[in-house]
From Swiss-Prot:
It comes from the Eukaryota. ATP binds at L46, G47, T48, G49, T50, F51, G52, Q53, V54, K68. The lineage of its organism: Eukaryota, Fungi, Fungi incertae sedis, Microsporidia, Unikaryonidae. SMART domains: S_TKc. One of its GO terms (cellular component) is nucleus. It catalyses: L-seryl-[protein] + ATP = O-phospho-L-seryl-[protein] + ADP + H(+); L-threonyl-[protein] + ATP = O-phospho-L-threonyl-[protein] + ADP + H(+); L-tyrosyl-[protein] + ATP = O-phospho-L-tyrosyl-[protein] + ADP + H(+). This is Probable dual specificity protein kinase YAK1 homolog. The gene is YAK1.
Length: 405
């Protein structure tokens, strides 16, 4: 019986095992072999994207895993080897409670294969399951606290993630809402200069856009954007390009710190030095008051809403120099649970307004979505244009829309 080919395009080029996009052509039932005794049988395709493919496999020991099969090109190999090095560093330091666990790495037919634990849905998929109505305070509080725990651990090792976003935060346990952070391909281990953009655009810090040397505070900015999106249901700064992105940030706060505009090597691209730096793009009509109204419009606890607003505004300080670090932000009053049992019960059982029956009854079925990719059913419509999900949580089609430029 002919095996079902999972890779598209499925035509191999010449005598190679790759298609025209440098992806390994794989079929259900094929094996990815590290050696003669250690093989992984391919069960299903979990996602495809800019850097390659992710397949669900079962190992020789019967354990199900997710394997990233990287495109057969040096630039993608180098990118993913950066993630391998950082994941090994986290594993060596026993810091895998908040991060995806790397299990193995090997080469197969000139493709880098990264074996990782199988996880659940990412937070964007989970948000989609709420029909973008957003999460409630107990659930959001649980998630933000864990992300900050992970960020504190990263800071101890001098690691800057550089691509925090809902797609790169996966649910490891639906009963406790345990999450894990994935995708360290863009991560760095020291403060960086301003020679290239990092971060997906919706979550990109102003210092990165302006071309100012950045550090771990850029991750704090991303966290603030994530917090708003998870609660309200849509991104805070859905910029179409960097001009639109910095314009939305500028519009929300009314202005940006003068020293950032003076020292940003890209400032002249967005601002004209006339009467104190005039923004050259179209004005944004979404103000700080609009942001507060959106949060309060959900009709939840006013006290919680107000504390969340204060939390987000601390994380979203336009100046990276006064933005709090992860340890400081983790002690914010919004994250302090007043009634632990009540909060936990609500976070674990209410599912933030998500219908109970959308959660698979059996945990093995929960593992059907993994590694930051959305698993569309045959009846499901394609993901909307603003987020073309890829293997590594990075936009598909050359990072168009929210991730590019």
């Amino acid at each position: 019986m002919k095996k079902k080919v999972l890779t598209f395009p499925s035509e191999k080029i010449g005598f190679s095992s790759d298609n025209e996009e440098f992806d390994l052509v794989m079929a259900r039932g094929d094996y990815l072999a590290k050696n003669k005794s250690q093989k992984y049988m391919i069960i299903d395709m979990l996602g495809t994207g800019t850097f390659g493919q992710v397949v669900r496999c079962v190992g020789s020991d019967g354990e199900e895993v997710a394997i990233k099969v990287v495109k057969n090109q040096p630039k993608y190999y180098n990118y993913e080897m950066n993630e391998v090095r950082i994941l090994h560093k986290l594993l060596y330091n026993n810091l895998n409670d908040r991060f995806v666990t790397i299990k193995d790495v090997f080469m197969y037919k000139q493709h880098l294969c990264i074996v990782e634990e199988l996880l659940g849905r990412n937070l964007y998929t989970f948000l989609k399951m709420t029909r973008f109505k957003g999460l409630d305070h107990p659930t959001l509080r649980t998630i933000l606290h864990q992300i900050l725990e992970g960020m504190v651990q990263l800071s101890l090792l001098g690691i800057i993630h550089c691509d925090l976003k809902p797609e790169n935060i996966l649910i490891a346990d639906y009963d406790t809402f345990k999450i894990k952070i994935i995708d360290f391909g863009s991560a760095v281990t020291s403060p960086q200069g301003s020679h290239f953009y990092v971060q997906s655009r919706y979550y990109r810090a102003p210092e990165v856009i302006l071309g100012i040397p950045y550090g771990s505070s850029c991750d704090i900015w991303s966290l603030g954007c994530i917090g708003y999106e998870l609660y309200v249901g849509h991104p805070l700064f859905p910029g179409k390009d960097n001009m639109d992105q910095i314009g939305r940030i500028h519009g929300l706060f009314g202005s940006l710190p003068m020293f950032m505009l003076e020292h940003g090597k890209n400032s002249s691209t967005f601002f004209e030095k006339e009467n104190g730096y005039r923004f050259m793009g179209p004005p944004s009509n979404f103000t700080l008051e609009d942001m507060k109204k959106m949060i309060r419009s959900k009709g939840n606890s006013k006290e919680d809403d107000n504390m969340l607003i204060k939390f987000l505004l601390r994380a979203l300080q336009p100046s990276h120099l006064i933005r709090p670090d992860a340890k400081s932000l983790a002690s914010h009053s919004y994250l302090k649970v007043r009634d632990t049992s009540a909060e936990a019960d609500k976070a674990c059982n209410d599912r933030s307004g998500v219908q109970q029956n959308i959660f698979p009854a059996n945990k093995n079925m929960r593992h059907m979505s993994t590694t930051g990719v959305i698993l569309p059913s045959k009846k499901q419509k394609p993901t909307d244009d603003r987020r073309k999900i890829s293997v590594y949580g990075i936009s598909y089609e050359n990072n168009l829309n929210r991730d590019s430029e």
